[in-house]
């Protein structure tokens, strides 16, 4: 049982969780590439993103103060929510290192926090590989923890590759005046993921514990070509062509996962 920290005044720690979520696809022709980007634009438009972030706010136990959202031309969307912490009971103020809920189970000062999402569809003009990136930031102050939204967000997008960063900044004082630079135990972001999510992804941690900085990279283990080709069935492809497409897609995923080009 985690011991409750008795604070002097408000909890001034800022906890920030950042996601980069990638969906990768193969669209062979120019028409298929345009259709894929149009599909992604519709699937993750500002209205849908607003609903996802509204669910995020509910999961972390906060209230929405203001919403700003925009669909962009030719592609992309963004949503920003200003949120505030409500009164939490001891049971709700939970920073325990454990997974948060899945989707089906559910920019300010001091007690004001924010959540944002921006989308970036793009495609390669020659090799047929298209990617969709969603950047999501959840920043909270006070008792509420952004770590509980991990599972929900990963399952809300077609997440082939995910990079997650969590950091705690500032300090808060206990009743004796001692400064505390983090108010909960954590040794890995992975401990906040459900077992099925952990089993589904290859993961690497790069953590700087003394700086309260945690980083996890995730790449989907299972590869089914039918889930990656757009506008055609993988079974209708020539075996050599199918293998070539799979090689290109796997290379794209590896390059994004390791943040470097593969020669």
UniProtKB/Swiss-Prot annotation:
Catalytic-site annotation from UniProt: 113 (schiff-base intermediate with substrate), 118 (proton acceptor), 141 (proton donor)
**What's the catalysed reaction?**
S-adenosyl-L-methionine + H(+) = S-adenosyl 3-(methylsulfanyl)propylamine + CO2
Q: How is the cofactor bound?
A: Binds 1 pyruvoyl group covalently per subunit.
Q: Which keywords does this chain's UniProt record carry?
A: Autocatalytic cleavage, Decarboxylase, Lyase, Polyamine biosynthesis, Pyruvate, S-adenosyl-L-methionine, Schiff base, Spermidine biosynthesis, Zymogen
Q: Name one GO biological process term.
A: spermidine biosynthetic process
- GO CC annotations, alphabetized: cytosol
Q: How is it modified after translation?
A: Is synthesized initially as an inactive proenzyme. Formation of the active enzyme involves a self-maturation process in which the active site pyruvoyl group is generated from an internal serine residue via an autocatalytic post-translational modification. Two non-identical subunits are generated from the proenzyme in this reaction, and the pyruvate is formed at the N-terminus of the alpha chain, which is derived from the carboxyl end of the proenzyme.
Provide the disulphide bond pattern: none
Site description Cleavage (non-hydrolytic), residues in chain: 112-113
Tell me any Pfam family this protein matches. Answer: AdoMet_dc
Top-level taxon in the UniProt lineage = Bacteria
InterPro entries in the cross-refs:
AdoMetDC_fam_prok (IPR003826), S-AdoMet_deCO2ase_bac (IPR009165), S-AdoMet_deCO2ase_core (IPR016067)
Q: Which GO terms describe its molecular function?
A: adenosylmethionine decarboxylase activity
Q: Describe its partners and assembly state.
A: Heterooctamer of four alpha and four beta chains arranged as a tetramer of alpha/beta heterodimers.
Q: What family is this?
A: Belongs to the prokaryotic AdoMetDC family. Type 2 subfamily.
Q: Which HAMAP family match?
A: AdoMetDC_2 (MF_00465)
The function of this protein is: Catalyzes the decarboxylation of S-adenosylmethionine to S-adenosylmethioninamine (dcAdoMet), the propylamine donor required for the synthesis of the polyamines spermine and spermidine from the diamine putrescine.
> What protein is this chain from?
S-adenosylmethionine decarboxylase proenzyme
Name the source organism.
Marinobacter nauticus (strain ATCC 700491 / DSM 11845 / VT8) (Marinobacter aquaeolei)
Name of the gene this protein is made from: speD
């Amino acid at each position: 049982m985690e011991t409750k920290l008795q604070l002097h005044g408000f909890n001034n720690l800022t906890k920030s969780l950042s996601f980069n979520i990638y969906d990768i696809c193969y669209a062979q022709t120019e028409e298929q590439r345009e259709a894929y980007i149009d599909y992604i634009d519709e699937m993750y438009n500002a209205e849908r993103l607003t609903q996802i972030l509204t669910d995020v706010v509910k999961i972390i136990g906060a209230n929405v103060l203001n919403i700003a959202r925009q669909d962009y031309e030719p592609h992309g969307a963004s949503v920003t929510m200003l949120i505030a912490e409500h009164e939490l009971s001891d049971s709700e103020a939970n920073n325990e290192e454990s997974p948060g809920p899945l989707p089906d189970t559910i920019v300010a000062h001091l007690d004001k926090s924010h959540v944002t999402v921006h989308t970036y569809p793009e495609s390669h003009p020659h090799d047929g590989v298209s990617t969709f990136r969603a950047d999501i930031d959840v920043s909270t102050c006070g008792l509420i923890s952004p770590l509980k939204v991990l599972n929900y967000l990963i399952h809300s997008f077609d997440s082939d590759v995910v990079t997650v960063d969590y950091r705690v900044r500032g300090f808060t004082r206990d009743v004796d005046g001692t400064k505390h630079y983090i108010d909960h135990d954590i040794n890995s972001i992975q401990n906040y993921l459900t077992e099925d999510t952990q089993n589904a992804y290859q993961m690497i941690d790069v953590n700087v514990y003394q700086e309260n900085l945690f980083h996890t990279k995730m790449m989907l283990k299972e590869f089914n070509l039918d889930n990656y080709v757009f506008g055609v069935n993988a079974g209708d492809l020539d075996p050599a062509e199918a293998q070539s497409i799979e090689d290109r897609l796997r290379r794209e995923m590896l390059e994004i996962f390791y943040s470097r080009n593969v020669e």
